[in-house]
Each structure stands twice: as structure tokens, then as C-alpha cells.
């Protein structure tokens, strides 16, 4: 890896416990015989400042928090100025607060060093917040390559749509019927479905933001009988069932008082609504 110009950082940090922070960062440079000790230590201090651990140079790994240890591991990986930095689930061992902090730090470090960085993660939030481009894999096969927002807004298939998004996208089985989607007793008109053959089995994907409450002067696409509602921070979500599947949508403040059992007329927005082939998972609309 060293000869290929690749720096590695893993989730377990892999720091030498008997060495100080300074010695750990300097260690990859020891093989450079032409590099004087003062130059190695200057490089170590430069990297320590980059990852903001310069005040911890004389401490050993056992005296550092998990986040601090990961910063040192990144500094050590950057010591030899690699062409590529590979981060293999580097935040898995950190608690939620530190993960958020380190996500921001890794993004900053990459932007300051301009080193091409490959970040391996199973966490969609990490992928979406850190990356310029996401490669989404399933069973070793590439499902989609796109910028984070494009991946969210324009999923290539059912797997991509269900992998990204919190709360997750709601998937309802349906059938194309006379240019519309029939799901159970409900029929929904969706632009683009009219081009699909009658009787085709599909999956209807609805993100929380895809539904809004219909105004009094307009027709509704669906009538939701509210099963429950709950609050996540500043957002209120209501839950109803469509052909036995749970569907969620955001409640505006003016009707946040609705109760279980109430009927609410809904309209589909122009975004967050997808139609997938039920067998292949390919996105159709």
C-alpha cells in the first residue's frame, strides 16, 4: 500500500500503545533515511495541527478519547502524502456525538489536503454528508454512482430508494390499471404511468415529503385515515395505511392537532414519488 501511495485508516485506529502521538505520526516517516529527525517532527506537528491534536503530542493512545485517537490515525495515514486515502468504516467505534463531529472533521481535512479519499461505510448519513460522489453497492455489485442529492432524488432502482432516507421511503405494491396505479382499493394518478402496459406489477415508492394535505378547493389523490402520529424534533409525522402498508407524511403545523381515526385528503407532490418494476426493482417512473 505504501508503494502504491495509499494511506489506510481502520475503525480500530491501530495506534502503537507504547508510543506518543508525536511518535505515532512520525512512525511512517522513519523509513525515509534522507529525512532528518527535525523534518519528521515538523511534518508531524503540521499534521497534528491539521487534525487539531497538536496539544496532545506527548500523550499516549490510552490517554486519548476515541475521537482523538481517530484524528491521530488520520494524521499518521497522511504523513507520507499518499495519493489516495482509504477510510474503512473509521467512525464505527465512536458514539453518536463523536461520529457527527468526526464526519465534519474528515470533510474539512479532505478539503484542506485535496487528497482523493475513499470512505467505506454502511451508514447512509455518513455517506450523504461526507461524499462528493457515492458508489452504492449491494452484494458486491454497483447499483448506482451519483452525487448524494442525486442519489436521493433520482434513485436508479428499488434498493437505492430504500437504502437512503430517514424516515425510510414507503413501498406499496400496486398494479398499472388504465394509466394509473391501483393499490388495494385506492387508485392513484402518477405522471408517466400512462406509458406502462396495463396489468404490470409495480412497487409505488412514497417519501414523506411526497404527500401534502389537499386544499379545500382541490381534489385529493388519496384519503388517509390517520393511524398514529409522532414528533421527531421539529417535524411531525402522521401514519396511515395504503393496501396494508405503512405510509408516512409530514404534518403542517395548522393541522398538527389531528387525532387517530381522522380522515385527511392528500395530494401527491411532483417529487419523492417513484414507480419500480416489482420483479427487477428497476425504476420505471
Annotate the PLM regions.
Residues 1-159:
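ABC ATPase nucleotide-binding domains
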Residues 6, 27, 65-66, 139, ...:
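Short glycine-rich loop/turn motifs that provide flexible caps or phosphate-binding loops at active sites
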Amino acid at each position: 500500500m505504501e508503494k502504491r501511495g495509499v494511506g489506510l485508516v481502520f475503525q480500530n485506529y491501530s495506534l502503537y500503545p507504547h508510543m506518543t502521538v508525536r511518535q505515532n505520526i512520525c512512525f511512517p516517516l522513519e523509513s525515509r533515511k534522507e529525512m532528518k529527525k527535525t523534518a519528521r517532527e515538523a511534518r508531524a506537528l503540521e499534521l497534528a495541527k491539521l487534525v487539531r491534536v497538536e496539544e496532545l503530542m506527548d500523550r499516549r493512545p490510552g490517554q486519548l478519547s476515541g475521537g482523538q485517537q481517530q484524528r491521530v490515525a488520520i494524521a499518521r495515514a497522511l504523513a507520507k502524502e499518499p495519493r489516495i486515502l482509504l477510510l474503512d468504516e473509521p467512525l464505527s467505534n465512536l458514539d453518536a456525538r463523536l461520529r457527527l463531529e468526526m464526519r465534519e472533521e474528515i470533510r474539512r481535512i479532505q478539503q484542506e489536503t485535496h487528497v482523493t479519499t475513499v470512505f467505506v461505510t454502511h451508514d447512509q448519513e455518513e455517506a450523504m454528508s461526507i461524499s462528493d460522489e457515492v458508489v452504492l453497492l449491494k452484494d458486491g455489485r454497483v447499483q448506482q454512482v451519483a452525487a448524494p442529492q442525486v442519489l436521493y432524488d433520482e434513485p436508479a432502482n428499488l434498493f437505492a430508494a430504500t437504502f437512503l432516507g430517514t424516515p425510510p421511503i414507503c413501498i406499496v405494491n400496486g398494479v398499472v390499471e388504465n394509466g394509473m396505479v391501483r393499490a388495494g382499493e385506492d387508485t392513484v394518478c402518477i405522471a408517466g404511468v400512462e406509458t406502462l402496459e396495463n396489468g404490470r406489477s409495480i412497487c409505488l415508492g412514497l417519501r414523506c415529503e411526497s404527500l401534502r394535505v389537499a386544499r379545500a378547493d382541490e381534489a385529493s389523490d388519496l384519503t388517509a385515515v390517520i393511524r398514529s402520529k409522532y414528533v421527531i424534533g421539529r417535524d411531525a409525522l402522521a401514519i396511515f395505511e395504503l393496501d396494508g402498508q405503512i405510509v408516512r407524511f409530514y404534518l403542517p403545523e395548522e393541522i398538527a392537532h389531528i387525532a387517530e381515526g381522522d380522515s385527511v385528503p392528500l395530494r401527491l407532490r411532483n417529487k419523492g414519488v417513484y414507480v419500480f418494476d416489482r420483479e427487477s426493482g428497476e425504476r420505471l417512473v
